Amino acid sequence: MEKDDEVKKRDRMKVKLKVENLTKIFEFNGNRVKALDNINLEVYENEFLTVMGPSGCGKTTLLRIIAGLDYPTEGKVLLDGKEVKGPGADRGVVFQQYTLMPWRTVLKNVTFGLELKGIPKNERIEIAKKFIKMVGLEGFEDAYPYQLSGGMQQRVAIARTLANDPEIVLMDEPFAALDAQTRNILQNELLKIWQKEKKTVFFVTHSVDEAVYLSDRVVVLTARPGRIKEIVKIDLERPRDRTSIEFLEYRKKILNILKDEVLKSLK
């Protein structure tokens, strides 16, 4: 039987990140809690993939394992075919909490990773200024984090991550603490940067609207222990209209997939 066009297209795509048979068990006071159960997932090069699910389903745990900040109990993560065994410059992480160094200016926050790599001063300043401009903060190079709004601080965090030129960008609910208007603006800016820089993005969110707006595919996890319940391909052209019938249909579909899992997580 001949493969359909979608499967053929997927076969031609390069797998950037592969999660194989991944299980994570935490131990608390002698009790074992299974957070993730037998996760198998492929993320393609230049793909924008989002993971979502009810609270406590293991979304952030999965991201931390991919980042090398935590370790699986069973299974493994492969990036470009190499097993992840700890943090590395090939993965950039943007967290929900603002993680800028308060004693460093915007420019020096963005150049920090480049300094660790030993890149010459003039070159790292040039690279940093490029990404500061890209996130719309040109003119704020000498500002300190306390002088910036939450949205501006997250822009700096994104610039800092991209300046290090990682193979994959991991984003753990980076816009969750922002007001709706700022969140929408940063979503649009993130998409522009993603399309320009052609990075692979692994994004975690609680927001169905955000997932449909940003993603090529949305991975929905079950209530704990997190398993992949369904992967939804978002077949909408960009820029996307949040009020279109097609957009709302995807939103409804994912909400329906999530409904039972959210109820389970509350029991």
Curated annotation (Swiss-Prot):
Q: Which domain of life is it from?
A: Archaea
Q: Which CDD domains does the annotation name?
A: ABC_NrtD_SsuB_transporters
In this protein, which residues make up the domain named ABC transporter? 17-248
Chain sites annotated for binding ATP: 53-60
Which SMART domains does the protein's record reference?
Answer: AAA (SM00382)
- Which is one GO molecular function term here? ATP binding
* UniProt keyword annotations, A-Z: ATP-binding, Nucleotide-binding, Transport
Alphabetized Pfam families for the sequence? ABC_tran (PF00005)
Q: Read off the SUPFAM superfamilies from this record.
A: P-loop containing nucleoside triphosphate hydrolases (SSF52540)
Q: PROSITE patterns of this UniProt entry?
A: ABC_TRANSPORTER_1, ABC_TRANSPORTER_2
The residue ranges crossing the membrane are none
> Which Gene3D superfamilies is this protein grouped with?
P-loop containing nucleotide triphosphate hydrolases (3.40.50.300)
Q: Which family does it belong to?
A: Belongs to the ABC transporter superfamily.
What protein name applies here? Uncharacterized ABC transporter ATP-binding protein MJ0412
Species of provenance: Methanocaldococcus jannaschii (strain ATCC 43067 / DSM 2661 / JAL-1 / JCM 10045 / NBRC 100440)
